[in-house]
Structures are given as structure tokens and as C-alpha cells.
Amino acid sequence: MARFVFITGGVVSSLGKGLASAALGALLQARGFSVRLRKLDPYLNVDPGTMSPFEHGEVFVTDDGAETDLDLGHYERFTGVAARRTDSVSSGRIYSNVLEKERRGDYLGKTIQVIPHVTNEIKDFISIGEDEVDFMLCEIGGTVGDIEGLPFFEAIRQFGQDKPRGQCIFMHLTLLPYIAASGELKTKPTQHSVKELRSIGIAPDVLVCRSEGPIPQKERDKLALFCNVRPESVIAAQDLKSIYEAPLAYHREGLDQAVLDAFSISPAPKPDLTVWHDVADRIHNPEGEVNVAIVGKYTQLEDAYKSIAEALTHGGMANRVKVKSEWIDAEIFEREDPVPHLEKFDAILVPGGFGERGTEGKIKAAQFAREHKIPYLGICLGMQMAVIESARHLTDLTDAGSEEFDHEAGKRRFTPVVYHLKEWVQGNHKVERKVDDDKGGTMRLGAYTAKLVEGSKVAQIYGSTTIEERHRHRYEVDIQYRDQLQAEGLIFSGMSPDGRLPEIVEVKDHPWFIGVQFHPELKSKPFAPHPLFADFVRAAKEVSRLV
């Protein structure tokens, strides 16, 4: 049966609970334990699938088609354990489940209340798969004191009471602000945060304190005294140059040992951190630099493309180079010539997105890359824009576009080389969708198999003609235009197994021009860079004349 670590936050949000959880998971793995990480979000959305990227950042999609918080991406990248639908839940999902049960009569006419019905639903979620791993790490979103988070805090308090003594511990992450005028780290906000946590019945076993620099022993002792934790369980979490330093940094601070001590696991297996030393070496000792332009729609918030940024870093590590990314708003190219903006880059990446805004700019970026022989990677919408660009400029389909952008019924503005996907095969059954279906959870989501053309560039990159990648889209390139486009050099090099859905296109006689309908960034890891990103950076490296 698993041991449970509940990770909570205080003082301010966005302190890095997800990274701390992921790093702890990696350290426990390094000691030979199996782990699974979960995220419990207090917001009332059922999932992040319909939330604006500006509100929430990227949506991380799992193999089984769940749309989840970006922290699950950190969990996967640090542990290599594929996340599942049962690793993410929100207040919206919990309340929805409770109300469905009430409508079915499952509660036998009782008055439905937060305690016990909502808290029991949360506890049931936490318990899923508890016999599968040695450690279950559960991160609670938000900060202690948030109204919407109270049912989750109450649920984990009860959970700790329900389990045998020594099977659950609580780790609290806080901020130690530095006051420049006095030259001091202030512990009072952390003391009040722990006081708030204790007032609802949760006493932290481990205290992780974010700070700009080292925490003097005097402050550690003070925190241990006033927060009622052991001095060795006050862990400093200093700002780092790279998130991939976190496992080694937390190990030096003794986080993994503090957790094992809290569980009375002694003697503890020694960690094998070889892989993380190699990762750190590749980050800190690059042999060159490449410049990549990311032409997107949500560039004001880098978290909107979090997995893409990390996958590029992984590609750089595979090639021993530093990837310097510059985010460019695609709308700029709708007003200005893209050449002065793009000619300085070694490669161009156009990521996914929804809606018409900025798409003409993305098309111009694809055109620049194709005509100037610059490596191009188009992901999801980025592939669709590359296909539209080729259709407009290489064939007689000069009005090529996407059904997504034809808003008025009966008034077609484009020849729809990209159409609304209404049916597809998933496993052994057919999935059907209607245009007026709910937006949430109705896209083509999760892992699907693709067949690659033997001898194609992508088949060489993958080293296989069969791949499985994660998808998140409701629009698709129309297969009826394949012959027309292939005659002009746009090769359809990857297809769904039934041959109906284009998955990958590549430009013939181009050094590196690939568009993919799926999201390869979701499966990249620092110790196992995704082959597409590794080869994309290799191509950029050649352009930069580093080879």
C-alpha cells in the first residue's frame, strides 16, 4: 500500500509546488521507489480544456485523453511516469460527480453536504491505484486559506486520520521574502501560513521555503521552533538557473531524506542520481547556441507553450547546444513583412492554437521557412497553416483556408483544405461529433497511432514506421487534396492507420520542413528528448554553421 505525501502551498501562489513535487518524485525514484503524482485543483471548471491559455497556461493532454493542468507535464518530464486521467481532478469534477450520484439516488435520500459527501468523493479519488506504487504524491492547487480549497484541505486532513499512523505526511511550500532595506529574510509570512494550516488540523512534517538565496541557520531554527517542525526538515528552495537542477538541489538540501525520515524509513536506500548529473552537465556545458523563433498566438504568457519550451531545451541537450527561443506574436506578420523579423533565426516553430486571430501571420511564417529553406516545425494548427500556405502558393487553391474560420453559415470564404472533424476511429470503435456539441472534452484527444511512409524523413527520425502520439484537435487536413498537394512537393508522410486522417506532412527537397497534427512536445523528457525536437534542433544547428 502506498505512502502518501500531500503538498500544500502558502503565502503566495505560483511558488513551484509542481516542480517541488516532481523533483521529490524523481529523488524517490532514484532511491528505487515507485511513484505516482496527482494534482487536485480547487477551481470550479470541470477541467482546463475550455480555459483560456492566458488564464491557465497550456493544457497538458494524457495518453488516455484527459485535459489536465500543466503541472502534470512537470510530473512526466521528471519521473517518466505517464500521467493518467485519474491523476488530475478539480472542484468542478468533484461536484459534478456528487451531483450525478445524487440524481441517481446513490445517497438514498440524504441531505448532500460538503462533509461528508464532497470530502468522501475527494478521498475516493486520492485512493485510486494506491496499491500500485510505493509513494503517492498529491499536490493541492492554490494556497492555504483559499475558500475554494477548503474541501480539499479537509479531505486530506481526514485522509491522514483514516490511514494508519505513519502512512501520510504533509509538505508545505512557502515564500521567505527578502527585504532589501533591512537585508533580512522575513519568516513571519511562513509562520502565519503554517498557523492557518494548523488551524484546519494539518501539521506540516516538512517545510520547503522558497528564497532568492541561502537561508541562514538562524532563520531555519526560528522556523523550526515556531512552525513545530524538525530543523532538518526546514528545506531551502533557492532560485535556480534551470528547473532541471531541482532534483540535485533538493537532494543537497536533504528533501528526500527528510521525507523518508518522516515515514521512519531507515536505513534508506542510497540514491543513484547519475541521470540528473548528466542532465545538469548538458545544461551547463553547451557547445554552441541556436536561435529559434516561436511564432504563436499566446506569446504574452510563456506558460501557454510550456511543454514546447521544455521540449526545445531537451532537443538542445541532445545536441549539446543552448536553444535560445524568441516568442513572436503571429499578428505582427499580418501588418509587417516577416523577413526582417525571421531572417536572423536558425529555425522556426509554429505551435498550436484555436481561432482565426494570428493565422495569416502563421501562414507567412511557414511561407518564409519553405522559401528560404529554414527548418520548420509546425504543430497542430502550425501544420494546418503550413498546408494552407502550400495550397495557396503551390496549387491553384488560392483561396485555401480552414472551416474553423468560416463563421457565417452559407457564406464560405475559403476552400476548406482543413475541415471540421466529425468522426474518427479510436481503438476498435468509431467516435462521432456534431458541430453543436459541447466544447469541453469533445476534441480528438489522447494517444493515437500513425503509420509513416517508409523512407520518409519522419520515418528516419523516428526509426520506425509506426508511432503513437498525443492529439488535441477538432479540425483536420482534408485528404481529398492530398494528390494535388503531393504533386507540388508537400508529402503526406504520416497517416492514421485507416488512411483517412493526415498526421504528418513534409516538404520535398527542403532541408527540414515538417508539420504534425499531434503534440510531440507532450512526450519529451530531459533524459529522453523527443526525436522530432532532437532532430529539429540538429537541423537548426547545421543552419547556424556550428557543425
UniProtKB/Swiss-Prot annotation:
UTP binds at residues 13, 186-191, 222. One of its GO terms (cellular component) is cytosol. CTP binds at residues 13, 146-148, 186-191, 222. InterPro entries: Class_I_gatase-like, CTP_synthase, CTP_synthase_N, GATASE, GATase1_CTP_Synthase, P-loop_NTPase. It holds the Pfam family CTP_synth_N. Keywords: ATP-binding, Glutamine amidotransferase, Ligase, Magnesium, Metal-binding, Nucleotide-binding, Pyrimidine biosynthesis. Its EC number is 6.3.4.2. This is CTP synthase. It comes from Dinoroseobacter shibae (strain DSM 16493 / NCIMB 14021 / DFL 12). The lineage of its organism: Bacteria, Pseudomonadati, Pseudomonadota, Alphaproteobacteria, Rhodobacterales. The gene is pyrG.
